[in-house]
Amino acid sequence: MKILIPTAKEMNTDLPSIEAIPLKPESQAVLDALALYSASQLESFYKVSAEKAAEEFQNIQALKRQTAQHYPALKLFDGLMYRNIKRDKLTEAEQDYLENHVFITSALYGVVPVLSPMAPHRLDFLMKLKVAGKTLKSHWKAAYDETLKKEEVIFSLLSSEFETVFSKEIRAKMVTLKFMEDRGGQLKIHSTISKKARGAFLTALIENQVQTVGEARRLNFAGFVYREDLSQPQGLVFVKEV
């Protein structure tokens, strides 16, 4: 069983660094393609300010020179979902669960264990980077599939941009999650609800050592409960009354 989570734009580097590990060939090819961009080219590539582009340029070049600081990915990323995940004061069982079951999908690093060392970087599958003439999705598809081909249960907390990197065969095994609020009988969904709830759901998986879809359906977390009437076998819906 694997749980897939996305990367985040927000990062926190106010952390103890950890030792880097060598990049996979697929990752090195992506880095080599990124490293060809000048700071001014990155400004339009990322659609960011000149100041931000200069910072990203330094991050890329540090990775290229193998001088970049690395941090556990789960703690480096600091978006709303990540801030709602239990990341500290884990029991030994919770730590083991994280290491064995939770994986981050990255456009630079591939599908990697959640505590893997990562350096600060900015890249997602909506960005039009060509790697040896291929799109990022095409470049990564085989490696992404290889990571999950033996898994029977895959919980996906990914957005569609990440899910579509995988083949249809792998996507058919994914259990997707939807989180909604019930406001006086009106069901609402928006990104803030979803991001917070993904983090809370993952925390519930970790704390309850969930291994099956049946166990996930029984979870009650942050006010969310499973709604069978709204769910599909491969698509679980959790609703919070507010």
From Swiss-Prot:
One of its GO terms (cellular component) is cytosol. GO terms for biological process: response to hydroperoxide. It comes from the Bacteria. InterPro entries: YaaA. It holds the Pfam family H2O2_YaaD. NCBIfam families: PRK02101.1-4 (NF002543). Belongs to the UPF0246 family. HAMAP family: UPF0246. This is UPF0246 protein SPP_1571. It comes from Streptococcus pneumoniae (strain P1031). The lineage of its organism: Bacteria, Bacillati, Bacillota, Bacilli, Lactobacillales.
